[in-house]
């Protein structure tokens, strides 16, 4: 970290410094803003009635940030990395949205706190395992880490990260890990019952569950190879979209039958 902070920003001919810097800053800022609606022990910074929509909107904002971070340097590999993330997003976003909608439908609310409270009898992860698994894969994808680090692949000289240096590189790297942490924290109220648990206060259970999810995600990203983009896109549209669509229908039918 001290080395990155002390490094001079890279200057490229014809680079659009404004768009480049805007894209770099957008990624960590969007990650922090996404966490505002996550209840920690029953309390959220912003308890929005459309918290799930807010989280998803901040995640989609990252698309624009990374594309601008790839476009701004006016370099071929960086631009390829930016477009790779957009293509990756087009593959994972629809299954991810269906996974989010499944939890919201079961709780009959878009408020994240209401979704956590609706799981006192049984965690959504238990009877909606497809949505839970797809959501966790989506977290790795929008963090472009592990098997989904294709936008920053070695075959394109680190892609969207390749031309950044100094504080800009630090911001982008921080943004990736902030998104991973925010995604892990959001999984707790959506699928793991929030801060509910015996013997400990709600904030402690929220922290323990978040750390457990984060540890699992880090284990996966350290051990799985990069997924080829064409195979991932095909699998997402041919397999994940139908599966998550069926998963949405399960809570929808249960709600209608009440």
Named regions from a protein language model:
Residues 1-258:
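Alpha-helical transmembrane segments of multi-pass membrane proteins predominantly involved
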């Amino acid at each position: 970290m001290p080395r990155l902070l002390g490094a001079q920003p890279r200057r490229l001919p014809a680079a659009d410094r404004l768009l480049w810097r805007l894209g770099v800053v957008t990624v960590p800022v969007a990650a922090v803003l996404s966490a505002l609606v996550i209840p920690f022990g029953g309390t959220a910074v912003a308890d929005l009635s459309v918290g799930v929509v807010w989280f998803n909107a901040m995640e989609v904002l990252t698309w624009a940030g990374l594309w601008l971070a790839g476009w701004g340097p006016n370099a071929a590999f960086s631009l390829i990395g930016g477009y790779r993330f957009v293509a990756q997003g087009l593959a994972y976003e629809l299954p991810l949205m269906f996974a989010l909608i499944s939890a919201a439908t079961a709780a009959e609310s878009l408020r994240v706190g209401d979704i956590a409270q609706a799981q006192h009898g049984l965690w959504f992860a238990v009877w909606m395992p497809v949505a839970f698994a797809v959501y966790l894969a989506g977290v790795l994808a929008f963090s472009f880490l592990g098997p989904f680090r294709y936008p920053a692949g070695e075959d394109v000289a680190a892609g969207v990260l390749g031309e950044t240096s100094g504080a800009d590189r630090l911001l982008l790297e921080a943004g990736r890990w902030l998104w991973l942490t925010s995604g892990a924290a959001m999984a707790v109220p959506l699928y793991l019952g929030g801060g509910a648990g015996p013997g400990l206060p709600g904030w402690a259970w929220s922290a323990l569950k978040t750390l457990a999810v984060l540890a699992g995600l880090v284990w996966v990203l350290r051990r799985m190879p990069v997924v080829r983009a064409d195979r991932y896109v095909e699998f997402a549209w041919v397999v994940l979209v139908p599966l998550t669509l069926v998963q949405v229908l399960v809570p929808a039918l249960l709600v209608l039958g009440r």
